[in-house]
Amino acid sequence: MKIECMKNLIYTFVGSVTLVLLTSCSAEFENGTPEPWQREINPNENYEYTIKHPCLVNTEADFERARRKVNERAEPWISGWEKLCESRFAQLSYNANPQEEIVRHSQGGNFNTAAFDAGAAYQLAVRWKISGDEDYAKAAVRILNGWAKTCKGVNYKTWPDDSHRLLAAGFIGYQFAAPAELMRDYEGWKTEDFEVFKKWIDKTFYPICDDFLDNHFNSSAISGWMSWDLPAMLTILSIGVLNDDDAKIKQALEFFYHGKGMGCIEWSVKGMHEDPAGKVKGRHLAQSQEMGRDQGHATLNVGLHAYFCRTAYNMGIDLFAYNDNIILDLCEYTAKYNLTSAEDVEMPFEPYYHPKYGWHEKVSADSKGRARPGWELLYNHYAKVKGMNAPYSQAFAEKERPEGSGERGTAEAGDLGFGTLLYTEE
């Protein structure tokens, strides 16, 4: 008992000192000075890009490959296509339900309605891009126009001061941007309607995400989570690309490199470890900030990183390779632990102090084995495009193949998915 009390006193003291240091030291530290165990950050940070629409998570090359492989009925693309065609969100009979206000708060809200409608618009757009059937294009555009002409904001009259508005804006913003980017050249989408949509998505989602990344709603940046910063970053980047807005694109990239918060790559990683099983050779496993919180959020960050890095990559900025491919190391750690629901996986762990929730001393088994989309994108990029060893990401991609999308509500509705169809390389 005395030993345990002494341990708690030490933790409290260390945590207090850590918090004081992190909140009161120089601007250089606030901008993301790496912790001592981290590798040297690559100084060659790239802000030079070229936009060739469509270039969010999907490019025309992705669709050309998918069309060819589906027509050949080649695996695994044809299974991915059939998975899409089976989705309840990818049907012409889908009925969207635009809301005047998107609401999310601790008691619930209607944000899933927006998330599901955005997901449906994306899936319908993908069906059009691959099949050429214009009925799917018309259905996607109806959803986008309906929301742009109906919705006036996020938590703007209900719960205006609730921080859940960031989660609604962050996750739903990029979901609406993705199908709009695919439909931008569709002749059936009137220019004036597309312009209305671009103004709507900017006015509705950007200010909330911008405010959060700037001051974290007047709270300490280190008291947040990766899964708060990353969707805000992704929405800002996506709106920037959709609207050809250089300032927003550079804002999102700058936060990835140097942001004051857990979405900054320097702050996302809390430990570097050797693989006890020896499968990851010549590299390390990178422990992410939320591995000690729960696996629902830890696996959520995999997809968010995948979509953010893919969007940048499609513009010529290789964030996948940044800091010696550290995104791969993050994914390998997360995949290794979540491949099974069994709790006997040996996982090294660096204790991490969270200013609000205290010490995380081991990997959390909460929601262990959570399966989300994103693994196909990451596995194919690192293993097939770059030729790198990614054993745990590969195993997770194979486990989930053919990959669908998130359909269980809350943040999972934000998983664009269908990576087997769209990201499998030849």
Residue ranges and their predicted role:
Residues 15-19:
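Hydrophobic helical h-region of N-terminal Sec-dependent signal peptides
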Residues 2, 26-28:
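Intrinsically disordered, low-complexity regulatory regions of eukaryotic regulatory proteins
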Residues 2-14:
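Bacterial N-terminal signal peptides that target proteins for export
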Residues 28-218, 230, 234, 254-257, ...:
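Extracellular glycan-targeting catalytic surfaces
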Residues 239-326:
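Flexible, glycine-rich surface segments
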Residues 168, 197-200, 220-232, 241-244, ...:
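Short, contiguous, pocket-lining structural segments
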